[in-house]
Regions:
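Catalytic beta/alpha-barrel core
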Residues: 195-199, 217-226, 246-251
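Hydrophobic faces of well-ordered beta-strands that scaffold small-molecule active sites
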Residues: 37-39, 92, 126, 194-196, ...
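Histidine-rich, glycine-flanked metal-binding segment
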Residues: 1-33
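Glycine-enriched alpha-helix->loop->beta-strand junction motifs that scaffold or abut catalytic
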Residues: 211-218, 235-242, 270-272
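Polyanionic/metal-chelating signatures
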Residues: 80, 85-218
C-alpha cells in the first residue's frame, strides 16, 4: 500500500490503515513510479509546430534576448498538457527557443498535474544556443558566437560596477538593454544556471574552458550529442548534461558521434545527466521510452 498526502508519498507498507475521506485507487499488478520531469520542452508555449501564430517561445528581430522570460507567455490551458500528464510527466522545464539571439532567454518550471498551481518557478535557467545552425546569429562563425556570448557577460560585469552611473546616464553606452544585463549578471554570479545547447565534442571543450573563467557560473550542457567523448572532463568539472538518447542519428557534422548508449557512458564516467524530450508535439512519451532505451543499452536501474 502507498499513502499519498498532498501529492507526496508519506507511507509505504502492507495493509495500511485508511484515513477519513481517503480516495482508494486499485493499482494491483501495476508498477508505481514517481512522476517524470521533462528537463526541456515547450509545452504551454506552442500548440502547432508549423503554425507560427501559435508559438510564443522565441523572440525575433532582436540580437540579444537574455531578458526574455517565457513564464509571461505560458498557457496553462494548452491542449498538450493532458497528453503530458497521461504519459506520466508531472513537471516540465519550459525553455525558450533560439530566435535571432544566441542567448534565447529564461526558462520556467511548471506542473502538469490537475489541482496544482501550474507555474512553480518563474526563472530556472538562462539558455544559450551554440549548435551548428546557431552560428548564423553571430555572423556565421562558431568563434564569433562564443565570443559574443562572453562579451555579453563582461558587459553585465561592467553594468554591476557602474549601475549608479548607468541609471544617471553618465557612463559609456552599453550595447545591451538593462533587462539583458540584469539577466546575464545573475548567470555570471551563479544565481541562475546557464544551459548551453551544444553538440560537438570540440565545442563542448571550448565552452567548458571559456565559461570556466567565471568561478561562480553554474554551467549545464543540453543536447551534448558527443558529451561521451569528453566525459572525464565533465566529471572533473562537475558539469551535468541534459540528453535525449533517442536522437542517435548523425543528422549533421556536429552529431557524427551520436550513439544510443550515451547515458551509460556518462554514468560510467560519473557524469550527472537527465533526460529531455525537446519537443511538445506528441513526443512527451519519448521521455520514458528514452529511459527504457538507456537501460537496454546498459544503464542500471
Amino acid at each position: 500500500d502507498l499513502r499519498v498526502e498532498d501529492g507526496i508519498i508519506t507511507e509505504i507498507g502492507a495493509d495500511l490503515a485508511s484515513s477519513p475521506g481517503a480516495t482508494f485507487l486499485d493499482g494491483e499488478n501495476h508498477p508505481v513510479t514517481a512522476g517524470f520531469i521533462d528537463s526541456g520542452t515547450t509545452i504551454g508555449l506552442a500548440e502547432v509546430s508549423g503554425l507560427g501564430i501559435s508559438r510564443d517561445g522565441e523572440q525575433v528581430d532582436d540580437d540579444m534576448t537574455a531578458g526574455f522570460q517565457v513564464y509571461l507567455a505560458l498557457n496553462e490551458n494548452s491542449s498538450l498538457i493532458p497528453i503530458a500528464s497521461n504519459d506520466g510527466i508531472t513537471r516540465g522545464l519550459i525553455v525558450p527557443e533560439a530566435g535571432d539571439s544566441n542567448y534565447a532567454g529564461q526558462s520556467a518550471l511548471v506542473r502538469f498535474t490537475r489541482g496544482a498551481a501550474f507555474l512553480q518557478q518563474q526563472t530556472v535557467a538562462q539558455h544559450l544556443y551554440l549548435r551548428e545552425g546557431d552560428r548564423r546569429r553571430a555572423g556565421g562563425s562558431r568563434s564569433s558566437a562564443l565570443a559574443a556570448a562572453l562579451e555579453a557577460l563582461e558587459e553585465s560585469a561592467r553594468y554591476d560596477e557602474q549601475r549608479r552611473a548607468f541609471n544617471t546616464n553618465k557612463n559609456r553606452a552599453f550595447n545591451l538593454d538593462e533587462s539583458d544585463l540584469i539577466a546575464l549578471s545573475a548567470v555570471r554570479l551563479g544565481k541562475v544556471p546557464l544551459v548551453v545547447q551544444v553538440d560537438r565534442a570540440a565545442d563542448i571543450i571550448k565552452v567548458v574552458t571559456a565559461f570556466g573563467a567565471y568561478p561562480r557560473l553554474r554551467l549545464i550542457l543540453a543536447g551534448a550529442t558527443e558529451a561521451w567523448k569528453v566525459a572525464p572532463l565533465l566529471n572533473v568539472e562537475n558539469i551535468p548534461v541534459l540528453i535525449n538518447v533517442m536522437e542517435n542519428l548523425p543528422q549533421n557534422f556536429d552529431r557524427l558521434g551520436a550513439r544510443l548508449d550515451q547515458a551509460t557512458l556518462l554514468a560510467d564516467a560519473g557524469v550527472r545527466f537527465a533526460f529531455f524530450s525537446g519537443s511538445p508535439y506528441s513526443e512527451t512519451r519519448s521521455l520514458s521510452q528514452a529511459a527504457g532505451i538507456a537501460v537496454a543499452q546498459g544503464l542500471s536501474w
